[in-house]
Amino acid sequence: MKKHNFNAGPSILPREVIEDTAKAILDFNGSGLSLMEISHRAKDFQPVVDEAEALFKELLNIPEGYSVLFLGGGASMEFCMVPFNFLEKKAAYLNTGVWAKKAMKEAKGFGEVVEVASSAEATYTYIPKDYTIPADADYFHITTNNTIYGTELKEDLNSPVPMVADMSSDIFSRPIDVSKYICIYGGAQKNLAPAGVTFVIVKNDAVGKVSRYIPSMLNYQTHIDNGSMFNTPPVVPIYAALLNLRWIKAQGGVKEMERRAIEKADMLYAEIDRNKLFVGTAAKEDRSRMNICFVMAPEYKDLEADFMKFATEKGMVGIKGHRSVGGFRASCYNALPKESVQALIDCMQEFEKLH
């Protein structure tokens, strides 16, 4: 039976990316060595990093004056590195969920943090719209997609101060005006690669402005100067990221990824809104294209476990909602085919007929 992978992360990757990574793990570039055992400074590996950086810049149309870094530590490390490198006195944060809240917590150790708005009172089911960003803030931090609650900023915001964005779960799903940001970061295990590598897009002239000492490993300048090679990088995930970037380009680039994301999300939301058994949880104008969250309608709440069992038997994987909110979550990242979305819709319709 075919499995349909809706996991929120680590998540689905294109089949050819998995297969080609597996080949390299056995024999990298005909070297007779596994990708897992070559030196990161081997002559065959530097071109991997160089091409991955070049494709990042090409696919996202990154302007001159920015560096692309491949680091460790996940987005959680960036919650600390961002204020370490950019927060001199004050930073503004938009609180749209758990990950934004965690980023705010780390920033408070480095200076004043202004929460410009929050949707916590509504369990983060919408993204705040009316707020004022302090003009004297060093930066304004946003989390563009909220995987737990299924909300998403689908366009770049306007800000009177430089922006920083956690784009862990929607990078490469839509075009971005990178010039609006001094830093974009994310864990790779949603739309880019297996877990283990963290991407950072950083504006070079924004680094080095704070007065504090920054340990070498936490200083963006260190990694800019060393081309992501200051310490041993996560070789296998970087190689898988390169293969995935090639795949995105071959499929038609970020605009095509956006078209597919809209199509898949529209299909599934239409079924949620039509089906008597299910209710969407996010405000309609803020619904995420990446993480589609829904619950049983109140009068059918007792069928939740039955539907989970039914869907699992039909090959649906990873649709259980986050433990903090419950219900269901279908993550529709770039590599998820439309056929999987249709299979979930068919499953929902079949279950509806039974009840």
Curated annotation (Swiss-Prot):
UniProt: pyridoxal 5'-phosphate binding residues: 75-76, 99, 147, 166, 189, 231-232
- Enzyme Commission identifier(s): 2.6.1.52
The molecular function terms of the Gene Ontology recorded here are:
O-phospho-L-serine:2-oxoglutarate aminotransferase activity; pyridoxal phosphate binding
Pathway it belongs to? Amino-acid biosynthesis; L-serine biosynthesis; L-serine from 3-phospho-D-glycerate: step 2/3; Cofactor biosynthesis; pyridoxine 5'-phosphate biosynthesis; pyridoxine 5'-phosphate from D-erythrose 4-phosphate: step 3/5
The enzyme's first-digit EC class, named in words, is: transferase
Q: What is this enzyme's catalytic activity, as reactions?
A: O-phospho-L-serine + 2-oxoglutarate = 3-phosphooxypyruvate + L-glutamate; 4-(phosphooxy)-L-threonine + 2-oxoglutarate = (R)-3-hydroxy-2-oxo-4-phosphooxybutanoate + L-glutamate
Chief localization: cytoplasm
Keyword field contains Hydrolase: no
Keyword annotations of the record: Amino-acid biosynthesis, Aminotransferase, Cytoplasm, Pyridoxal phosphate, Pyridoxine biosynthesis, Serine biosynthesis, Transferase
One record GO biological process: L-serine biosynthetic process
Provide the function of this protein: Catalyzes the reversible conversion of 3-phosphohydroxypyruvate to phosphoserine and of 3-hydroxy-2-oxo-4-phosphonooxybutanoate to phosphohydroxythreonine.
* UniProt name for this protein: Phosphoserine aminotransferase
